[in-house]
Swiss-Prot record:
PANTHER family, sorted: 50S RIBOSOMAL PROTEIN L15 (PTHR12934), LARGE RIBOSOMAL SUBUNIT PROTEIN UL15M (PTHR12934:SF11)
Name recorded for this polypeptide: Large ribosomal subunit protein uL15
Keyword Ribosomal protein: yes
Organism of derivation: Acidiphilium cryptum (strain JF-5)
Keyword Protein transport: no
Gly residues bias locations: 21-35
Domain of life: Bacteria
GO biological process: translation
Function: Binds to the 23S rRNA.
The protein's assembly and partners: Part of the 50S ribosomal subunit.
Cellular component annotations (GO), alphabetically ordered: large ribosomal subunit
Length: 161
């Protein structure tokens, strides 16, 4: 068998029924749309219209909002950082900054506010890294390997009750 000899199984793609071609076809005259009315006309019925019943988007209360000041950070796991160092994309001997990470192709996009270091994976190399943010487990992993983490964005501590 060759690629140019491949065929569908018989009946795998049934031909669609042609509409409005006589009463003998089973879909003649009104083409399965019933008689008159809004839904029999050309075009689609109104989205969200429930026949006069109060629609669900008006029955339920408004919730939440989109924060225009929200900042998104590119995630970078410790294991990924170790792999980048081993592959030679990043030099562990020099201080690693967000500019270094961007040049190495770790993240791109002007909408991201920076990099957040996360703790998944393991690292054995001693590195000095400066990122926007870091999780406690990531800082512990880097410091256990003899390195240091500097964060440029201060994280607010939760208010104690």
């Amino acid at each position: 068998m060759k690629l140019n000899e491949l065929r569908d199984n018989p009946g795998a793609r049934p031909k669609s029924k042609r509409l409005g071609r006589g009463i003998g076809s089973g879909k003649g005259k009104t083409s399965g749309k019933g008689v008159k009315g809004q839904k029999a006309r050309e075009g689609v019925s109104l989205n969200g219209f429930e026949g006069g019943q109060l629609p669900i988007y008006r029955r339920l209360p408004k919730r939440g909002f989109n924060n225009v000041n929200r900042k998104d950070y590119a995630p970078l796991n410790v294991g990924t950082l170790a792999a980048l160092i081993e592959s030679g994309k990043i030099d562990a001997g020099q201080k690693i900054t967000e500019a270094t990470l961007r040049a190495a192709g770790v993240y791109a996009g002007s909408k991201l506010a920076g990099v957040r270091l996360l703790g998944r994976g393991e690292i054995s190399q001693k590195v000095e890294i400066e990122v926007s943010g870091a999780s406690a487990s990531a800082i512990a992993a880097i410091e256990q390997a003899g390195g240091s983490v500097t964060t440029t964005v201060a994280r607010a501590e939760p208010a104690s009750a």
